[in-house]
C-alpha cells in the first residue's frame, strides 16, 4: 500500500490537526520520498515510518510537537539536518537499520537540544573505532545510544513514560491514568461489597432476634397450656372423689334402714 493511501486510512475521519500519533510502518514510499504529510499535522507527537523504503527526509513537513520519530529499516544515508529545522523538539530518534556511515552525518543532530535517545543499531557507523565515545562526544545532549547510556545502563522500555502527565484532559489518557481509574473502580466495588455484607449481617441479626422472640412466646404458651391441663386434671380428680363418696353413702343408707326394721 502506498504511503499516501495509508495515511488517509489512519486518519479515520479525523482532521490532520487532531492526530497526535501516526503509524505508517511497512507501507511503500514513492521514489523513497515522504508523501501525504503536510504542515496540518501540527499536533503530531509520535510518527513511525519503519520499513517504508525511505531514502530522503527532504519532504518531511514542519512538526513542532513531534517528540518521537521511528525511521528504522530504511535507506537513509544523510540529510539529517532537516530534522533540526522541522522537528526541533524530538526526544527519541530511531535510525537503526539505515545506511548511515560517517560521524559527520550524525553531527547534524547536535542542534536537537531535546534529543535524549538515539538508535543507530545495525548501521555501518557502528563499526567505527570508538564509535560510542565519539557519538557521546559529538552529541553531548543525548543520554542513551543504542539503548544504553555511557555507563552501559539500559534505557527504560519507553522514553515517553515520563511524558504521560503532559497530556491535556481532552486528550487520550496514558496507561497510568487508565490504571488509576481501574484502581478507583476496584475500590468502589470493594466498598459496595462491604456495604452489602453489612446489610446482610443486619438482616441476619434482625431475623435471629425475631426467631428468639417467637421461641420465647411459644415457650410461654406451652407453660400456660401445661398449667391449664394440670388444673383440669385436679378438677377431674375432685369430681371422681365426690362421686365415690356419694356411692358409699348410698350403700350405707340401705344398711341403716335395715337396722331400723330389726328394731
Curated annotation (Swiss-Prot):
Entries under InterPro entries matching the protein: AN32, Leu-rich_rpt, LRR_dom_sf
Compositional bias (Acidic residues): 148-172, 180-203, 214-242
A GO MF term: histone chaperone activity
Cellular localisation: Cytoplasm; Nucleus
Residue windows of the LRR repeats: 43-64, 65-84, 89-110
Protein's UniProt keywords contain Chaperone: yes
Stretches the record annotates as Disordered: 146-263
Swiss-Prot/TrEMBL keywords: Chaperone, Chromatin regulator, Cytoplasm, Leucine-rich repeat, Nucleus, Phosphoprotein, Repeat
Annotated PROSITE patterns: LRR
Entries under Pfam families matching the protein: LRR_9
GO cellular component: cytoplasm; nucleus; Swr1 complex
Principal location class: cytoplasm
Posttranslational modification: Phosphorylated. The phosphorylation is nuclear localization signal (NLS)-dependent.
Region (ZID domain): 202-263
Subunit structure: Component of a SWR1-like complex. Interacts with H2A.Z/H2AZ1.
PANTHER family found in the cross-reference section: ACIDIC LEUCINE-RICH NUCLEAR PHOSPHOPROTEIN 32, ACIDIC LEUCINE-RICH NUCLEAR PHOSPHOPROTEIN 32 FAMILY MEMBER E
Domain commentary: The H2A.Z-interacting domain (ZID) mediates a direct interaction with H2A.Z/H2AZ1.
Role played: Histone chaperone that specifically mediates the genome-wide removal of histone H2A.Z/H2AZ1 from the nucleosome: removes H2A.Z/H2AZ1 from its normal sites of deposition, especially from enhancer and insulator regions. Not involved in deposition of H2A.Z/H2AZ1 in the nucleosome. May stabilize the evicted H2A.Z/H2AZ1-H2B dimer, thus shifting the equilibrium towards dissociation and the off-chromatin state. Inhibits activity of protein phosphatase 2A (PP2A). Does not inhibit protein phosphatase 1. May play a role in cerebellar development and synaptogenesis.
Family as reported in the entry's similarity comment: Belongs to the ANP32 family.
UniProt protein name: Acidic leucine-rich nuclear phosphoprotein 32 family member E
Species this protein is from: Xenopus laevis (African clawed frog)
Amino acid at each position: 500500500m502506498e504511503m499516501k493511501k495509508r495515511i488517509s486510512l489512519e486518519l479515520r475521519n479525523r482532521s490532520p490537526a487532531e492526530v497526535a500519533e501516526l503509524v505508517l510502518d511497512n507501507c511503500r514510499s514513492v521514489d523513497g520520498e515522504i508523501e501525504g504529510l503536510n504542515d496540518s499535522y501540527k499536533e503530531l507527537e509520535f510518527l513511525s515510518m519503519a520499513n517504508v523504503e525511505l531514502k530522503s527526509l527532504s519532504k518531511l513537513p514542519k512538526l513542532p510537537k513531534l517528540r518521537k520519530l521511528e525511521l528504522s529499516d530504511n535507506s537513509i544515508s544523510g540529510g539529517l539536518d532537516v530534522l533540526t529545522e522541522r522537528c526541533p523538539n524530538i526526544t527519541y530518534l530511531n535510525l537503526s537499520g539505515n545506511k548511515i556511515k560517517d560521524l559527520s552525518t550524525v553531527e547534524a543532530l547536535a542542534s536537537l537540544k531535546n534529543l535524549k535517545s538515539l538508535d543507530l543499531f545495525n548501521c555501518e557507523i557502528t563499526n567505527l573505532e570508538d564509535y560510542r565515545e565519539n557519538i557521546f562526544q559529538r552529541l553531548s545532549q543525548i543520554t542513551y545510544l543504542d539503548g544504553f547510556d555511557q555507563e552501559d545502563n539500559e534505557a527504560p522500555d519507553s522514553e515517553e513514560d515520563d511524558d504521560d502527565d503532559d497530556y491535556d484532559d481532552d486528550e487520550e489518557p496514558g496507561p497510568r491514568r487508565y490504571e488509576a481509574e481501574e484502581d478507583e473502580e476496584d475500590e468502589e466495588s470493594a466498598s459496595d461489597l462491604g456495604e452489602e455484607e453489612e446489610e446482610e449481617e443486619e438482616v441476619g441479626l434482625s431475623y435471629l432476634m425475631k426467631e428468639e422472640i417467637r421461641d420465647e412466646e411459644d415457650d410461654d404458651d406451652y407453660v400456660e397450656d401445661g398449667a391449664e391441663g394440670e388444673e383440669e386434671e385436679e378438677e377431674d380428680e375432685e369430681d371422681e372423689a365426690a362421686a365415690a363418696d356419694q356411692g358409699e353413702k348410698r350403700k350405707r343408707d340401705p344398711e341403716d334402714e335395715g337396722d331400723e326394721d330389726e328394731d
